[in-house]
A protein has these predicted regions:
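Glycine-rich, proline-tolerant flexible connector loops at the mouths of alpha/beta enzymes
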Residues: 12-32, 72, 138-150
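C-terminal helical cap(s) of enzyme catalytic domains, especially alpha/beta-barrels
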Residues: 81-88, 180-215
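Conserved anion-binding
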Residues: 61, 65-139, 143-144
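Hydrophobic faces of well-ordered beta-strands that scaffold small-molecule active sites
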Residues: 15-17, 45-49, 68-70, 93-97, ...
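Conserved, mostly hydrophobic/aromatic
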Residues: 7, 15, 47, 60, ...
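Charged helix-capping and loop-helix junction motifs
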Residues: 28-35, 78, 118-123, 149-158
């Protein structure tokens, strides 16, 4: 909750709140934390983790979420995307994708916190998700996540060029240039990071000034 307030004051454009083990542990997201975070952060808030039915989405939106992110449940039941988008609008539904490069080329989609390879092709799943009503894609590269050597520009660009909705690059940021590259070379509409900001390695204000100078 304190971090939500920190990011709000630091100039973040949006805050993504993930309960990363909710799907694996088969439980619902921590709604009490969300309620307090929404009170302190006056920027768009996306919430994800363990969201598997319409009632959960409704409750999260009422508690202050602006958008919900779905991953594993969408793969298990693609109609969940369609139903959610019809009920709440595509602008509320973010399709989260954890992808990893495949031997021989291309990328596979993983679920359950990156523990299970679905065998789905990343580009095909992104296109289907958008066709079913997802209004945004949050793309995390498992190859790059936590490494700090930059976002996965190849898969980011491939998916951004494939779909007609905003794509958010996630996983791999280590310096300011990586954000620039995600937006230019990778064709992403936005870039997400956690560790860099959590531990004060980069300041959001400095990053935004840098990106403005870079055009």
């Amino acid at each position: 909750v304190e971090m939500a307030e920190f990011y709000n004051q630091s100039g973040a454009d949006e805050l993504v709140f993930y309960d990363i083990t909710a799907s694996v542990e088969g439980r619902k997201i921590f709604t009490d934390i969300l309620t307090e975070a929404a009170k302190r952060a006056f920027i768009p808030l996306t919430v994800g983790g363990g969201i598997s039915d319409i009632d959960q989405i409704r409750a999260l939106l009422r508690l202050g979420a602006d958008k919900v992110s779905i991953n594993s449940p969408a793969v298990r039941n693609p109609d969940f995307i369609t139903e959610s988008a019809l009920r709440f609008g595509s602008q509320c539904i973010v399709l989260a994708m954890d992808v990893k490069s495949r031997a021989g080329g291309g990328w596979d989609v993983y679920v359950r916190g990156g523990r299970e390879n679905t065998g789905l092709d990343a580009l095909e799943w992104a296109a289907e998700g958008v066709k079913r009503g997802a209004g945004e894609i949050l793309l995390t590269s498992m190859d790059c996540d936590g490494v700090g050597n930059g976002f996965a520009l190849d898969v980011t660009r491939a998916i951004a060029d494939e779909v007609g909705v905003p794509v958010i690059a996630s996983g791999g940021a280590g310096k300011m240039e990586h954000f620039r590259d995600a937006l230019t070379v990778g064709h992403a509409d936005a870039a997400l990071a956690a560790t860099l900001f959590h531990f004060g390695i980069l300041k959001i204000s400095d990053l935004k000034e840098y990106l403005a100078r870079e055009g």
